[in-house]
């Protein structure tokens, strides 16, 4: 299987989400600092999601 940057982007996206599970729980339990970390992580998710969208579009356009 050849290298595909989409795999790395998707793995990064999953890692950001998985790494912040504890902070989400802490925020629900009342830790406001954890909420700040969650918001920061969600900005990273937004950015990575956009990169995934762009890469998918680029790969789709290369096929046609």
Where in the sequence are the language-model features?
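N-terminal acidic leader/helix
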Residues: 1-23
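Short, surface-exposed loop/turn segments at secondary-structure junctions
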Residues: 28-36, 63
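A charge-rich, low-complexity, intrinsically flexible signal that marks solvent-exposed coils, linkers
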Residues: 10, 34, 54-57, 61
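Metal-centered catalytic cores of metalloenzymes
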Residues: 3, 11-14, 38, 49, ...
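Short acidic DE-rich linear segments
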Residues: 1, 61-64
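A structural signal for well-ordered alpha-helices, especially hydrophobic packing surfaces
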Residues: 17, 21-24, 46-49, 53-56
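Short, charged, amphipathic alpha-helical segments
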Residues: 35-43
């Amino acid at each position: 299987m050849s290298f595909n940057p989409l795999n790395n982007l998707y793995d990064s996206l999953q890692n950001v989400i998985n790494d912040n599970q504890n902070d989400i729980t802490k925020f629900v339990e009342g830790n406001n600092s954890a909420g700040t970390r969650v918001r920061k992580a969600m900005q990273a998710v937004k950015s990575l999601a956009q990169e995934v969208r762009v890469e998918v579009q680029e790969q789709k356009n290369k096929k046609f």
